[in-house]
């Protein structure tokens, strides 16, 4: 029993060592936070230097480095950061490259950094307007069939004049038949008027008889 007790004590020793190892990363993380440089970033310094320049054609890379060095920035150590910062600002649209390619050349600020953001919503609003117009077009298209129904009704109206025309055509023979009756009625009257004219010579015969009687008396 006395021999096993000392063996248990070394086994319990690794547990405090593990706790100490777990605490060390926290201290390392705190050291990393302390290493971060306090103050503005490279991009902020570049934008301030470019905005401070009054050159119309833009600020060259050499002039930019001079301005950053005058502000206390270590240009030689952070040369690669300056180039990366310039490229990122050009890609975002905050800076415009007037000369050269890549990080070399001249740079100037865009007219208004917020213009790009303001124009985007306007484009979205203009894109939304055609949708509303497209929504109105189907409604107009739905109304058009009603006009087509009105056009279908119009042939019915056209049929009515055709029916009236047939009625008139039926009535017209009756009117044409009436003058025939009138002509037939007038012709007997003319015939009657002719007969009395023929009867006048018959009336002259008695006068001749009277003349013969008067002559006989004279004898």
From Swiss-Prot:
Ranges annotated as spanning the membrane: none
Cellular location(s): Nucleus; Chromosome
Biased composition (Low complexity): 1-20, 28-40
One of the protein's GO biological processes: negative regulation of DNA recombination
Keywords: Chromosome, DNA-binding, Nucleus
Keyword Nucleus part of the UniProt annotation: yes
InterPro entries documented for this protein: H1/H5, Histone_H1/H5_H15, WH-like_DNA-bd_sf, WH_DNA-bd_sf
Domain H15: 38-111
Pfam families named in the record: Linker_histone (PF00538)
Record GO cellular component, one term: nucleosome
Name the record gives this protein: Histone H1.11R
Organism: Gallus gallus (Chicken)
Phylogenetic classification of the source organism: Eukaryota, Metazoa, Chordata, Craniata, Vertebrata
């Amino acid at each position: 029993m006395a021999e096993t007790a000392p063996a248990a004590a070394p086994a319990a020793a690794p547990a405090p060592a593990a706790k100490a190892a777990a605490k060390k990363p926290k201290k390392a993380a705190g050291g990393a936070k302390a290493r971060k440089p306090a103050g503005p970033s490279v991009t902020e310094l570049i934008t301030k230097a470019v905005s401070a320049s009054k050159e119309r054609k833009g600020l060259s890379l050499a002039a930019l480095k001079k301005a950053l060095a005058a502000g206390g920035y270590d240009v030689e150590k952070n040369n690669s950061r300056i180039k990366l910062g310039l490229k990122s600002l050009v890609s975002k649209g905050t800076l415009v490259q007037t000369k050269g390619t890549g990080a070399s050349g001249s740079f100037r600020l865009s007219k208004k950094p917020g213009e790009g953001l303001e124009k985007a919503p306007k484009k979205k609003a203009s894109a939304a307007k055609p949708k509303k117009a497209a929504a109105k077009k189907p409604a107009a298209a739905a109304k058009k069939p009603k006009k087509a129904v009105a056009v279908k009704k119009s042939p019915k109206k056209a049929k009515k004049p055709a029916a009236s025309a047939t009625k008139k055509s039926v009535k017209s023979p009756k009117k044409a038949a009436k003058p025939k009756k009138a002509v037939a009625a007038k012709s007997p009257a003319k015939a009657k008027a002719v007969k009395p004219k023929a009867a006048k010579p018959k009336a002259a015969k008695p006068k001749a008889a009277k003349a013969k009687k008067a002559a006989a008396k004279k004898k």
